Structure formats: structure tokens, C-alpha cells
């Protein structure tokens, strides 16, 4: 049976939708809508379902595209060409979404599918996907784009790294604990169908050789490790960009107001959280040139990704949004020849191994494996450079790279795990003169730094050419480094050559999702009409589960429309 195309009911807002898992779990009754007065930016008069006005209005410093015709009966545009320090008029919509990563995107997709007349504004700090290109490919080094074009912009950071969709609820964070395993797995199927309808490859990695998988698992068990074999749909970096480009076009054509190069500075909260009377009324935003205005909305969704995790943590503290510090992952990205990982790559594509090595028994795991891939650099606010990896469908290297992450849980009185991880990252950057550090594993065991001339003689040639040879152990804490070393030695028992002397370790690899927003199964926070999704919420880790959280949120909001 041929795969349905872009004209499928899922994409075009048919009422014939897949079942809404959350709605079957006993949702709260929808609160009555309050009518918002028209304003001098957008003026509404009625809500026809089928009239669609497609327009792009651009004012200095903010691109607003996809003005809803079915939500805007009469469109009045009075956008002033104001100076950068003046305030512009407010905007009123039904739903405002902060962050155009997978969680924010799928909130909009699912909401439009079941409630196509909903007026939605999607606020994104970065650029449209067609303008998201890293200059490093041309100039050979990071030029410090602000904000980083790899971590910000439409589709977020995950889709721009390797584009892997994990098709099991066992991978991707703790969301199943919140909503239930069955609900999570059913939502994965709906999200996967959506990606397929936008052009994802139908081939699934890791399901063709169960006998080989069983043997790899046996070897892992003998080494004291757990293998999580998860089916993977690999988009590839270049294919992910094509798919998300189609999704961006679809949202624009459906009338979503896409506000790029626009930063959310605050949420608008009325009432008192201490007396359970607090409610979110929208957000305040600032454009690239400094213009500020408010977006008033009945529902506010914050999905700022790992890059926005510390910002959301500050927001939670300022507005008494209930949250708690969670674990933080600190580690390295390792790189080795494809020959070492050939069997695992061919059978599983991505091996997810978990261990609790002596002496500290911290959880250590592999993450984001890229056969034939490339190590990359990402920049966060403040110029923090962190390492990542990605892979292409067509372009291949001679190496495989993957992350090894050590999970740190902190006890009272310490409650700043994100700041802790950033300090470690800053120390790595200082030792590398602003660049990513790289060191050979054999040199670590020998207690010496790595020199550039030694890398040039190695069988493993770095795919991040501007990484600086040095001493990773001088930057990572003893507990972290010891756990990583012992984990690598254990993996070497299951995959001979994994811990060879020439295996490269790049640092720092940091995952900023340690702030966990307290929510219920309906994805409600303690602030009415405010929802926090994706990796910044602390509940998901990765592309698929962030998409799932957005899918469920969109279905929930549509049921109340």
C-alpha cells in the first residue's frame, strides 16, 4: 500500500484523526474562552474554517509569516517601521508556542489537525530552516554566530545533528513515567506516521537480525552492561532539513504566525501561585533589533529545548512554577574507526549501552551513535562550545562517533546542576583556547596529554579538524572521568577495540535538561494555561520523545478548542 502523501488527513486538518490518548484518560473540562479585543496588529471578525489568507508581513527585526485567514476575518495591518528601542503593538492569538523545535512543532501540527481554525503564534529565537547554515563548512572554523545556527532555528538542535527517531518508549527520557508506557508508545506511532507523511525514509534500522542482536546482548551482559536495542528511523542530517522544510511550509500555509529572530523574555502571569490562582496570559518577546511587545494567548506552551533549559529554570524560580533539580549528564564524544564498530553498526545502527561502573556506580550510557558520521561543535549563550555529532545519508566518513554520558544526581543543599555542568564546559573551553578539546584514550591511561603531531600519525583522523589536542582529564571531574574510563573498558569486552589507544575523546559533551518542571499526566503545570514541553522541561531527551510530548499537547489543546 503506498504511503500517504502530504494531502493526508493528518496534515490537512481533517476531523478524522487518530485517537487522542490523553482525552481517554479523563481530561479536565475545557475552561470557557475569553474573547480578546482586536488590536492594531491583527484584527479579527469571525472565524471561518475554510478561508485562508496567506501573507507575510515583515517589520524591522521580526519576520511574521502565515497570517491565518480562517482566524482572521478582516485583516488590518498597521505595522509601524519603528526604531529599535520602541514598543510595538500587542498580538492576540489562541495559542502561543515558544520554541520551534520538535515539541513546539508537533504541538502546532497536532492542534491544527484537530482544530484547524486555531490561531497560533510560534516564536523562535533562531532562523527559518532555509537560512540555517553553519558558516564553518565554508570557512573551516566556528565564527561564533549569535545565536548558534546549529542549536537554534526551526527544527531545533536535534534534527540538525543526526536526525534519528527512536521508535521505543524505553529511549528518550522519563515521559512514560508521567503519561504511561502504552500512551507513549501509541503516540510514537502517530508521530512516526507524521514524519513518514512528510517524506521520511520507510526503512527502519535494527530489526533485521534478531540472532545477531541476541549475541551482542549476551556479550554486553557478560561485560556487566545492559543493551537497549531500539528500532531507529534515521533521517540523516540533510534529509531532516528537507523534512522540516516541508513541515515549516505546511505550518505557514496553514496560517501559523511564524515569528523568527524573536526571543521570549518572560511569561505573563496574573494571580498568585501560592494560592493556586495564578494563570498565564501569554508571553513578552523581543525582536533582533530590540523591539518589544506582548503576545496574549489563552494557552501558552514553552518548548525551548536544551539550549533554553537554564532560561526556563530561571523563569520557574521567578514565577513560582513548581520544579525540581534533576540529574545532569556530563561526558565526552568518542570517535573510532568504522571497522571497530562495523558489526554493531550493521546490526543495530545505534547501540545503546548502559552501565554502572565502579567505584562510584553512577549511571553511564552511550548516546547518539553516528556510523560514518562527523563530530561537530555547538555554541550556547555566552560562547560556551560543546561537542556533538551528526551523520548524513549520503556523505560518510571513515569513523563512528558517539557520546558517553555520566549522569550526576546532586543532594541538598546544592540545586544548580546546569550551572555545575556549564562551569565544567567553560574549563574545557579555557584549556582548548575556546575550542573543543580532544585526547587519545591511550594517553589518558598513560597519564599524559595528547599532542597535535600524535593525532596526525593516528589511524583515527579527527573529523572535527579545529579541535585542539590536549588533556581532557584536566577539565572533567575525577568522578566523571573515572566512570567514563571504567565504562569504556567494560564496553571493550563486548566490542573489542572500543577502548583502543587511538580512540579519541572530545570534551565537553553536556546535556542541559536537569531542571524538571512538575506536571501531571495532562501536561498541566501549577500555573493555569501554562505548559512546558520537550527537553527543557526535563521530561524528554531527544527528537522522538520531544515530538511525542508536543503531539500529546496539541491533541489535548484541540480537545478543549
Regions found by a protein language model. Name each.
Residues 3-8, 17-25, 29-31, 35-36, ...:
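Short, low-complexity intrinsically disordered segments enriched in A/P/G/S/L with frequent Arg
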Residues 27-30, 37, 42-48, 60-71, ...:
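Intrinsically disordered, low-complexity terminal tails and inter-domain linkers enriched
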Residues 38-43, 49-53, 64, 134, ...:
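Alpha-helical transmembrane segments and their juxtamembrane interfaces
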Amino acid at each position: 500500500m503506498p504511503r500517504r502523501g502530504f494531502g493526508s488527513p493528518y496534515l490537512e486538518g481533517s476531523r478524522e484523526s487518530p485517537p487522542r490518548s490523553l482525552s481517554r484518560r479523563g481530561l479536565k473540562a475545557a475552561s470557557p474562552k475569553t474573547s480578546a479585543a482586536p488590536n492594531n496588529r491583527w484584527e479579527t471578525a469571525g472565524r471561518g474554517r475554510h478561508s485562508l489568507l496567506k501573507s507575510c508581513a515583515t517589520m524591522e527585526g521580526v519576520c511574521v509569516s502565515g497570517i491565518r485567514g480562517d482566524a482572521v476575518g478582516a485583516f488590518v495591518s498597521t505595522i509601524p517601521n519603528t526604531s529599535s528601542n520602541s514598543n510595538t503593538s500587542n498580538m492576540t492569538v489562541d495559542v502561543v508556542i515558544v520554541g520551534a523545535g520538535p515539541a513546539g512543532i508537533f504541538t502546532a501540527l497536532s492542534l491544527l489537525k484537530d482544530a484547524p481554525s486555531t490561531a497560533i503564534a510560534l516564536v523562535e529565537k533562531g532562523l527559518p530552516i532555509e537560512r540555517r547554515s553553519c558558516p564553518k563548512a565554508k570557512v573551516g572554523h566556528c565564527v561564533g554566530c549569535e545565536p548558534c545556527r546549529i542549536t537554534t532555528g526551526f527544527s531545533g538542535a536535534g534534527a540538525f545533528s543526526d536526525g534519528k527517531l527512536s521508535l521505543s518508549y524505553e529511549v528518550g527520557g522519563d515521559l512514560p513515567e508521567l503519561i504511561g508506557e502504552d500512551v507513549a508508545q501509541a503516540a510514537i506511532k502517530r508521530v512516526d506516521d507524521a514524519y513518514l507523511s512528510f517524506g521520511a525514509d520507510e526503512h527502519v534500522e535494527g530489526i533485521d537480525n534478531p540472532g545477531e542482536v541476541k549475541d551482542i546482548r549476551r556479550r554486553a551482559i557478560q561485560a556487566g552492561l545492559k543493551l537497549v536495542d531500539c528500532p531507529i528511523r534515521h533521517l540523516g542530517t540533510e534529509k531532516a532539513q528537507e523534512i522540516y522544510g516541508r513541515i515549516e511550509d505546511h505550518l505557514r500555509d496553514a496560517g501559523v504566525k511564524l515569528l523568527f529572530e524573536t526571543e521570549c523574555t518572560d511569561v505573563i502571569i496574573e494571580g498568585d501561585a501560592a494560592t493556586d490562582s495564578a494563570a498565564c496570559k501569554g508571553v513578552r518577546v523581543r525582536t533582533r533589533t530590540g523591539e518589544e511587545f506582548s503576545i496574549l494567548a489563552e494557552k501558552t506552551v514553552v518548548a525551548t529545548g536544551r539550549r533554553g533549559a537554564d532560561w526556563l529554570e530561571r523563569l520557574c524560580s521567578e514565577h513560582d512554577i513548581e520544579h525540581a533539580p534533576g540529574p545532569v549528564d556530563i561526558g565526552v564524544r568518542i570517535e573510532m574507526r568504522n571497522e571497530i564498530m562495523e558489526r554493531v553498526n550493521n546490526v543495530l545502527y545505534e547501540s545503546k549501552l548502559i552501565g554502572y561502573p565502579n567505584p562510584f556506580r553512577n549511571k553511564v550510557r552511550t548516546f547518539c551513535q553516528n556510523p560514518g558520521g562527523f563530530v561537530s561543535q555547538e555554541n550556547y549563550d555566552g560562547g560556551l562550545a560543546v561537542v556533538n555529532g551528526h551523520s548524513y545519508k549520503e556523505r560518510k566518513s571513515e569513523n563512528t562517533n558517539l557520546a558517553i554520558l555520566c549522569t550526576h544526581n546532586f543532594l541538598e543543599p546544592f540545586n544548580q546542576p546546569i550551572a555545575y555542568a556549564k562551569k565544567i564546559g567553560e574549563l574545557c573551553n579555557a584549556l582548548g583556547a575556546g575550542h573543543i578539546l580532544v585526547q587519545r584514550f591511550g594517553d589518558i591511561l598513560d597519564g599524559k596529554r595528547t599532542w597535535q603531531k600524535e593525532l596526525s600519525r593516528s589511524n583515527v583522523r579527527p573529523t572535527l579538524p579545529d579541535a585542539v589536542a590536549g588533556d581532557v582529564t584536566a577539565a572533567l571531574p575525577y568522578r566523571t572521568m573515572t566512570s567514563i574510563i571504567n565504562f569504556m573498558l567494560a564496553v571493550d569486552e563486548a566490542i573489542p577495540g572500543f577502548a583502543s589507544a587511538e580512540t579519541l575523546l572530545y570534551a565537553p559533551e553536556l546535556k542541559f535538561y536537569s531542571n524538571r518542571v512538575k506536571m501531571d499526566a495532562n501536561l498541566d503545570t501549577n500555573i493555569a494555561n501554562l505548559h512546558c514541553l520537550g527537553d527543557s522541561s526535563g521530561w524528554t531527551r531527544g527528537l522522538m520523545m520531544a515530538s511525542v510530548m508536543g503531539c500529546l499537547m496539541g491533541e489535548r489543546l484541540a480537545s478543549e478548542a
